[in-house]
Amino acid sequence: MNYFFSLVLVFLVLSVVVLGVVSAPYQGVVALMGVSFFCCIFMVFLGRTFAALVMYIVYLGGLVVVFGYCVSVEKESGIYSVGGTKYFIVCVSLLLVVLLCLLREVGGLLVYVNWGDLVCLEMNGVGVFYFSGGWGLIVCSWGLLVVLFSILVILSWSRLGGLRPF
């Protein structure tokens, strides 16, 4: 179980590294989907299954809207590839860190003894989101709306509106 948990965390870090390296928006979409997926898997390991499902649906909904619009108005047709010495050094450094952690058997960082404390966190389910978690969902949806309008302003949506050529 701890090995699978550490594998999920390694994939989470790798997807964040890929997100920092890519230069095309549609490649960033795939990297962000990976980050959100592995974060939700991490939440499932901690016993927050319903929260992980709701956050994954909310996050992917906002992600599809924002980056769907970004990709539709993208004017460049060139495909960028990830290469060069900078990316090679980053990948080799990350590989060395992972190997050092594995050789030292992770050093007990991923070992949590009291799993009994985290077992019954999902008893309330939807009731928690409507009562005390509702404000969190409102803040998340407000953040997605702010990101959507900032992307629209960055892409200068007021110049052409719906009359832009595809």
UniProtKB/Swiss-Prot annotation:
Source taxon at top rank: Eukaryota
User: Any stretches that span the bilayer, and where are they?
Assistant: 4-24, 27-47, 50-70, 82-102, 109-129, 135-155
**GO CC, alphabetical:** mitochondrial membrane
Substrates-to-products reaction catalysed: a ubiquinone + NADH + 5 H(+)(in) = a ubiquinol + NAD(+) + 4 H(+)(out)
Location, primary (coarse class): mitochondrion
What are the protein's UniProt keywords?
A: Electron transport, Membrane, Mitochondrion, NAD, Respiratory chain, Translocase, Transmembrane, Transmembrane helix, Transport, Ubiquinone
| Record EC number | 7.1.1.2
Instruction: Name a GO molecular-function annotation.
Output: NADH dehydrogenase (ubiquinone) activity
Q: How does it sit in the membrane?
A: Multi-pass membrane protein
Subcellular localization is given as: Mitochondrion membrane
For the protein in the UniProt heading, the enzyme class is translocase
Q: What does this protein do?
A: Core subunit of the mitochondrial membrane respiratory chain NADH dehydrogenase (Complex I) that is believed to belong to the minimal assembly required for catalysis. Complex I functions in the transfer of electrons from NADH to the respiratory chain. The immediate electron acceptor for the enzyme is believed to be ubiquinone.
Give the record's family classification: Belongs to the complex I subunit 6 family.
Provide the protein name.
NADH-ubiquinone oxidoreductase chain 6
Q: Which gene encodes it?
A: MT-ND6
